[in-house]
């Protein structure tokens, strides 16, 4: 099934997670416009301020300290970083310890060190700085905007429609279509004239630093292993299924 809408502008909307895992990175890389969904609530249990990297005895967490005490429910755009340079330096040391023998250690660490050297005070700024640096390293060009730059409200479905229209999108790419936890009525989205595409992601296999293979890690694990070639690896296996097309909705 193909999208036959003439000029396609593919939009993805997703929380700006920390050191995103490979599936999320591929979703952004395959989009024309990525809308960082920074108006949603910050949640500790998500990957907003933590991510997994490879470890000798299994995946290891990297966590970013943020200010939550006394803040209650706060949107991602308002979450402040704490801890000065201590955790930044600790992250870089841990990454060095785990990846110093990787083929592209020097190049990728240089990218990360520059991003970590920034003076960001907000989590969303830091996360988007990292994402932008990794996209640039792999040669991927994507327009990155923030949800808070645009007027949007109502329920989850209405927000998706408004944000997609705000950047003149006619295709919305989702990574959660068909999952048990559906927060969006996709038939309403397609009724608004927007094609809905579902990301069908298969993680590439590559030589990691430790065996056996550890899936679902930050994309930096892939970059340390294969360098800029990661963009081509992901593009070659990329599949976006247009599951709902205006005029042909289905549940």
Where are these regions (language model features)?
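Residues lining hydrophobic/aromatic ligand-binding pockets adjacent to catalytic sites
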Residues: 2-251
């Amino acid at each position: 099934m193909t999208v036959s809408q003439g000029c396609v502008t593919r939009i993805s909307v997703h929380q700006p997670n920390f050191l995103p895992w490979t599936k999320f990175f591929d979703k952004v890389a395959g989009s024309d416009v990525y809308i960082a969904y920074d108006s949603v609530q910050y949640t500790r249990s998500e990957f907003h301020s933590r991510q997994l990297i490879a470890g000798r005895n299994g995946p290891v967490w990297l966590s970013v300290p943020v200010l939550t005490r006394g803040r209650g429910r706060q949107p991602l755009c308002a979450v402040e970083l704490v801890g000065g340079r201590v955790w930044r330096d600790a992250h870089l040391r841990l990454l060095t310890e785990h990846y110093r023998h990787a083929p592209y250690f020097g190049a990728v660490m240089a990218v990360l060190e520059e991003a970590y050297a920034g003076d960001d005070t907000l989590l969303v700024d830091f996360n988007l700085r990292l994402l932008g640096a990794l996209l640039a390293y792999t040669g991927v060009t994507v327009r990155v905007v923030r949800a808070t730059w645009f007027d949007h409200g109502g329920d989850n479905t209405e927000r998706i429609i408004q944000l997609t229209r705000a950047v003149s999108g006619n295709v919305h790419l989702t990574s959660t279509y068909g999952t048990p936890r559906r927060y969006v009525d996709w038939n309403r989205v397609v009724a608004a004239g927007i094609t809905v595409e579902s990301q069908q992601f298969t993680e590439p296999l590559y030589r990691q630093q430790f065996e056996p293979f550890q899936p679902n890690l930050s994309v930096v694990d892939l970059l340390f292993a294969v360098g800029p070639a990661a963009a081509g690896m992901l593009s070659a296996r990329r599949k976006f299924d247009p599951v709902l097309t205006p005029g042909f909705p289905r549940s």
